[in-house]
Amino acid sequence: MTKNFRIEKDSMGTIEVPIEALWGAQTQRSIINFSIGEELIPIELIYSLTLIKKAASIANFNLGLIDKRKKDLIVEACTEILDGLHDSQFPLKVWQTGSGTQTNMNVNEVISNIAALKTNSELGSHQPIHPNDDVNKSQSTNDTFPAAIQISVVNEIIKNLVPTIRELTQILDKKSEEWKDLIKIGRTHFQDAVPLTFGQEISGWSEQLKDAENAIIMSLNELYFLPLGGTAVGTGINCPKGFCEESIKSISDDTNLMFYKSKNNFSIMASHDRLAQVMSQIKILAGALFKISNDIKILSSGPRSGIYELIIPQNEPGSSIMPGKVNPTQCEALSMVCAQIMGFEYAVSMANSSGTLQMNEYKPLIGFNILTSLKLLKNVIENFRIKLVDGMEPNQKKMKLNLENSLMLVTAIVPKVGYEKAAEIANLAFKESLNLKEATIKLGYLNEDEFDEAMNINSMI
């Protein structure tokens, strides 16, 4: 009978590993010991760790610490991982050691075994590439894992989230310009206020998103400084001079992003204030999107018993019992994602404040929450733009009706009659179901010509 496992050995003894798995003993122990939940370490984080391993091998070769054959084998293995050929070989859960050591070893072991396959060596033999002595040379999980989180977060924000936000603000700006002359009633406290244009209202949404985007980009500044070379506690034990600079140069070349050596490894390794700051700005973006989704839900309410100044695309039936009902489902999906991100931010803040002495032991949670938030935001913003914003249209007839019926237009005649008389006019109009002109004339405060001259809606914009 063919065995479906092989026997591997580590410092704790022997263990059975699936026969075709490219991971090794330490990864297998993590699978057994941490069967918790379904959340896996994000593949983006795996790729960033792999980038570090590739860069480290080049640095170690340039410093004369490994030979060219070992360097080439590690680089080839890393290239295959970065090409997505081995995604299934990274099965570890987020809920593991707080340093991320098991995931670091998962990457080390897979690289080692890819090299073994390329040289017809036995899986798990650690030949010709040893996961610790070669792949992990000059490194510790304590410096590589936080560096990998930082690289992943910067990469995801700059290359994915920011372009997605800009696509949304561009369409909002286009619609703002298109409807710049469409006058509607404004609302504060859910009550009628003075008029504005629909273009102005939409411009507020767009600018709010641009402000959030800029704040996120600014918060990234400190993430470009990596703690590589700090090794175990920040002192750089077992890391040769020049390794950090060599590694970071390779990472910068591979990502087309400019990373630098950290000014103080002790700070970055013991706490993740910089990551928490980025997550805080991500939460602010979520808050802006939440507000916009709520505005659209309110403005599109109806169609006959609500405000209904905004017509949204009808993508699917809204009810299993009420025929013809269409709901603002894209807004609801966006709101749920934003609520989830706000919860993630709280967890990151709590995790960041809970580190001890020379290390924060919540690294997998912090990395997972931030990267998951970024992916969710990218997906939901794109969906929101395509399925709702692109197709939304103003209900000009309802806007005109609501504008003409609003008692708050009385604000326009305050300069003529004063605040107290204007309030009296509005109250009379409401109580006796009069329009503002009728109420003003009835009270004798202005004649018809004086009212018409004062009631210039365009002058209120």
Residues of each region from the PLM?
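Conserved, well-structured ligand/cofactor-binding cores
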Residues: 1-461
